């Protein structure tokens, strides 16, 4: 094995392939963040966490870097500017942020602070619209998607009265009647968009957000009926935006090109009917390479941001040239690409359950045959082919488990079976190599079987729900000690009392594996892991399984060559979570007091118990982050 180095650490955790220039390892073996991109100052993530802990924050902790949000937005705008220059496209471009991706004020507000025609906001519900109306600047583009009732439409029209460039996107035929009635009542001319349901389908975990099975959008017949209704009402000039959605996290750039070919036909045909379409909103789809493989895997993408922009601009440029049409302004809703990189969850390991090492127990006269067979196999390790020997050992191990279940082996011999089997497994693994093709399947099996369990102070369901819900992959890296070779392999489990509260796939060496190289814990020292690219959707979708709530969250902003912590938000406490599920806090306290009184303990002990109960009621929902001794 080659000597460990910082470059080896980068390669092991595939950092250059998913980091997009925002994350790296410094010479001291610490994960560093470059919030302004590859050329900007490097900030040690461990320093940020330690500073936040010193200011009263707790682990686990979500660390936000708002500068990354600005850099991602600038990169997206730059990619489209270059693509439009390449294809002589003069229609312009607006990057719209759909706040459903992450509605937190620090995220949406940071993005909304970027003024100009090149940025806008999208809402998909009444609460989101209320936030967008507050965040948007005069003249700012606001796209109103989602199901709409009369109040939603009224609020959107009020936005126009307040000077915002609000588009009400008709997603269902019934919405048009409400728009007509409310615009007349308010005395404001509506500006409309229409969402088409494309037949083209991009492969991926979210493929049904596009295509014929899409939840939203009009069919071709419904589009014709809508246009007729607008013309009959003298409102044909109100339709200014064509919207469609090809899917989310599209992995293959060819799927984007195919969807755009279909979408441009709708643009041309609507224009032929007399519609004056000024904006084409292509929705989302720009994916993130979570696993760093640059492939068509659902957790990856096989294209760059520049290639994505070109795949949008070129078909529209060609369509306009073919039909002799004015080039419309292009709008995207690439919220995942804007936000995923900006947030890192940092959590400490609370305990490690080591993989069984196995041992050869002392020989006993009363050993049953199954134990004796395993002992003999261990003695033959240097004399027989390793793969053949292991399969025979696995057979005897399974036989022993069956005998124990039938009551034909006692607990002592059951333990000896495990001791011998795992001793054989470790010895066989040491004799295998990936260079030998016939060894690879067994080596994969043993790498999955002979791993430690790292119990980490967080909840998968709260902080990374997509891991549980759709087998999403996120890069995971120790935030320090990367100058040391990791001596163990481990899997990660959370604090919840749920067998699904674990992570099964890990980014390693430009691939995915069932375990991750990790370090041994040191007594008295915290071992902290960073969970990267969690800035899109995860906080918003997180649930309160086992009543684990929001984690503490901080924002670290670049200042010169350093940083400052500009905001700190305390995570949920136990009383907040209990109140959320219907427990009256006064009733809880009264119940505790009654039970303490009924215990008839000495006054000083009763006081200590009441104090401990109150501390438990108002404390953080996660574990104390003190390192193990």
Model region roles, listed by residue range:
Residues 1-31:
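Charged, compositionally biased N-terminal leader segments and the immediate start
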Residues 64, 71-83, 91-93, 101-104, ...:
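Secondary-structure-rich domain cores
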Residues 88-281, 286-291, 302-307, 315, ...:
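Active-site-proximal beta-alpha core segment in soluble small-molecule metabolic enzymes
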Residues 20, 25-103:
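Low-complexity, highly charged intrinsically disordered N-terminal segments
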């Amino acid at each position: 094995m080659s000597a460990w180095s910082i470059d080896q650490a980068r390669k092991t955790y595939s950092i250059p392939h998913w980091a997009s220039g925002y994350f790296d390892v410094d010479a001291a073996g610490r994960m560093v963040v470059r919030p302004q991109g590859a050329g900007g100052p490097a900030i040690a993530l461990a320093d940020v966490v330690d500073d936040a802990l010193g200011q009263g924050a707790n682990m686990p902790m979500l660390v936000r870097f708002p500068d990354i949000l600005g850099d991602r937005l600038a990169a997206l705008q730059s990619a489209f500017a270059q693509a439009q220059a390449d294809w002589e496209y003069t229609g312009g471009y607006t990057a719209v942020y759909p706040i459903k991706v992450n509605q937190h004020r620090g995220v949406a507000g940071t993005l909304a602070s970027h003024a100009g025609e090149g940025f806008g906001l999208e809402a998909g519900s009444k609460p989101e619209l209320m936030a967008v109306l507050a965040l948007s600047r005069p003249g700012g583009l606001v796209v109103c998607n989602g199901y709409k009732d009369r109040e939603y439409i009224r609020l959107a029209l009020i936005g126009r009265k307040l000077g915002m460039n609000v588009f009400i996107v008709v997603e269902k035929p019934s919405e048009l009647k409400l728009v007509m009635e409310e615009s007349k009542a308010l005395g404001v001319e509506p500006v409309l968009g229409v969402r088409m349901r494309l037949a083209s389908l991009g492969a991926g975990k979210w493929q049904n957000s596009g295509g014929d099975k899409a939840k939203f959008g009009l069919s071709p017949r419904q589009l014709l009926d809508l246009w007729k209704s607008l013309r009959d009402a003298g409102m044909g000039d109100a339709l200014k935006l064509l919207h469609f959605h090809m899917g989310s996290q599209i992995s293959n750039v060819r799927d984007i090109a195919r969807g755009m070919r279909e979408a441009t036909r709708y643009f041309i045909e609507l224009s032929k009917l007399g519609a004056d379409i000024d904006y084409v909103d292509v929705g989302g789809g720009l994916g993130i390479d979570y696993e760093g493989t640059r492939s068509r895997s659902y957790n990856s993408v096989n294209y760059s941001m520049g290639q994505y922009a070109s795949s949008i601009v070129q078909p529209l440029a060609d369509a306009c040239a073919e039909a002799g049409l004015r080039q419309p302004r292009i709008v995207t809703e690439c919220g995942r690409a804007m936000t995923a990189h900006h947030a890192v969850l940092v959590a400490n390991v609370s305990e490690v359950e080591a993989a069984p090492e196995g041992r050869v127990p002392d020989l006993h006269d009363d050993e049953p045959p199954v134990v004796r067979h395993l002992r003999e196999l261990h003695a033959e390790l240097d004399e027989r082919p390793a793969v053949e020997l292991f399969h025979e050992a696995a057979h005897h191990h399974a036989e022993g488990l069956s005998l124990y279940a039938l009551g034909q082996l006692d607990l002592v011999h059951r333990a000896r079976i495990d001791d011998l089997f795992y001793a054989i497994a470790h010895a066989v693994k040491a004799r295998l190599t990936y260079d030998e093709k016939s060894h690879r399947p067994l080596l994969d099996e043993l790498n999955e079987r002979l791993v430690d369990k790292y119990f980490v102070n967080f909840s998968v369901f709260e902080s990374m729900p997509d891991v549980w819900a759709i087998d999403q992959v996120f890069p995971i890296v120790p935030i320090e000690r990367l100058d040391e070779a990791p001596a163990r392999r481990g899997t990660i489990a959370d604090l919840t009392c749920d067998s699904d509260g674990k992570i099964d796939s890990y980014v390693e060496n430009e691939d995915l594996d069932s375990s991750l190289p990790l370090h041994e814990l040191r007594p008295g020292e915290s071992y902290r892991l960073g969970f990267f690219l969690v800035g899109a959707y995860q906080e918003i979708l997180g649930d309160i399984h086992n009543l684990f709530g929001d984690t503490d969250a901080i924002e670290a902003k670049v200042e010169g060559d350093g940083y400052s912590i500009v905001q700190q938000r305390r995570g949920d406490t136990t009383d907040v979570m209990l109140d959320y599920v219907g427990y009256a806090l006064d009733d809880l306290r009264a119940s505790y007091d009654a039970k303490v009184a009924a215990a008839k303990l000495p006054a000083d002990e009763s006081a200590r118990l009441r104090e401990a109960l109150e501390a438990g009621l108002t404390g953080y929902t996660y574990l104390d982050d003190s390192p193990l001794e």
